[in-house]
Amino acid sequence: MIDMEVGIVGGGLAGLVAAISLVEKGVDVSIIGPKSKDSNSYLAQAGIAFPLVEGDSIRIHVLDTIRAGKYINDEEVVWNVISKSTEAYSFLVSHGVTFTGNELEGGHSHPRVFTIKSETGKHVIPILEKHARELGVNFVRGFVEEIGIKNGKLAGVFLNGELLKFDAVVVATGGFSGLYRFTAGVKENIGLLIGDLALKGVPLRDMEFVQFHPTGFIGRRTYLITEAVRGAGAKLVTGDGERFVNELETRDVVARAIYLKMLEGKGVFLDARGIEDFKDRFPYVYSVLKKEGIDPGKDLIPVTPVAHYTMGGISVDIFYRTRIRGLYAIGEAASNGFHGANRLASNSLLECVVSGLEVARTILREEPKRGANDAPYNFDELGDVDSIREIMWNHAGIVRDKSSLLEGLKKLEGVEADQRLKVVAKAVLTLALEREESRGSHYRRDFPFMRKEFERPSFFHLNV
């Protein structure tokens, strides 16, 4: 046994991989958070991008990633993550994951997205959670209210007002797409701990880059129609049958094209009637649509863009370290330049596995010790989250401009909500206002082109 206690906040793919990797080396590990089924990883349909098919290569996958990220990716990070794809694949397979096929998705040069019946997360997460339990990972169910930090030193995490002390804490809570009115992800993913750390002096990175999935379906709740459906040949059309975009363009391009058609008052539909084996290839999507009274073999599927993934988050280095010793962030909660201005489809789960493996190595190498024995507790009420969601959707959405962003910032001041949620929203609005160009998922109608002077990452840092 290694004399070190590690707390991982969040039990999605990144958190589970980190926990398994650490406990296998004799570290005392606890995962604190809701059930793993309540994570965006569990909802992931399409799969995981691995450059392992014939004709593909790490270099080609790197180039696809940087092209999608509109050239502000950290190239060292991109190479680091994708060069570890074989290790990531081997980790999953050795722990019982069996992929059933591979698909082509938008922005990819090859069909490198490895999937399990197009409901990948639903299969991978239970397998890894079972392994984690068998290995002795301690699962603590609950809602972590804040990270315990005193004078810049880590003490642990607060759960129901009680400080749980750890030598190292890994934030693996996911992103903040739940701060938007329409999202197909977990509504509870509102970026609370991202804002918490910002208020405690930890920089945030690239917060203006929010990816909107082009093909959300709003029924009894909001669902995603996986990108792989378009990869299999489905077409995007208006109500009168007009095709208006290359369906396999990157998500930012497709989402914006759909949104602009909707602004013209036109409905947009996915025509999947030409996919003969739809039910077998996409069983989850098929079952959802049938319950909503839509037969994808006969009917057009109404779609709309929805907030899906946040490229920004807690600023970390290539080893997933924050500026506070012993505090790390991985997966969607973290941002180190892997995705740039726009995430390439199915790169997120690859990042989850690689960041989980990498942060475990970092912790084992550094062997951090708890820096403080107590910390102030400030959590109160979340407050009016829905008003923030409306502001984000209306003022920091798919199409932005100066006047709308300024109006959003002004409205935000009057919202009575947790300051940590407000600072997440403020970071998005502020960095979107400062970035006077359009790049990737960030589109300014008043600055509709990329500009060389903005070919760099963005940082949001409060002086505390």
From Swiss-Prot:
Gene Ontology biological process: NAD biosynthetic process
Entry keyword set: Cytoplasm, FAD, Flavoprotein, Nucleotide-binding, Oxidoreductase, Pyridine nucleotide biosynthesis
Marked site (Important in orienting the L-aspartate substrate) residue numbers: 105
The protein's enzyme class: oxidoreductase
Residues at the catalytic site: 251
Cell location: Cytoplasm
Requisite cofactors: FAD
Binding positions for FAD per the UniProt entry: 11-14, 40-47, 332, 348-349
GO cellular component: cytoplasm
Keyword Oxidoreductase carried by entry: yes
Entry's Gene Ontology molecular function annotations: L-aspartate oxidase activity; nucleotide binding
EC number: 1.4.3.16
Highest taxon above the source species: Archaea
Cofactor notes: Binds 1 FAD per subunit.
Catalysed transformations (reactions): L-aspartate + O2 = iminosuccinate + H2O2
Pathway, per record: Cofactor biosynthesis; NAD(+) biosynthesis; iminoaspartate from L-aspartate (oxidase route): step 1/1
Task performed by this protein: Catalyzes the oxidation of L-aspartate to iminoaspartate, the first step in the de novo biosynthesis of NAD(+).
Similarity-based family: Belongs to the FAD-dependent oxidoreductase 2 family. NadB subfamily.
Name the record gives this protein: L-aspartate oxidase
Organism this protein belongs to: Pyrococcus abyssi (strain GE5 / Orsay)
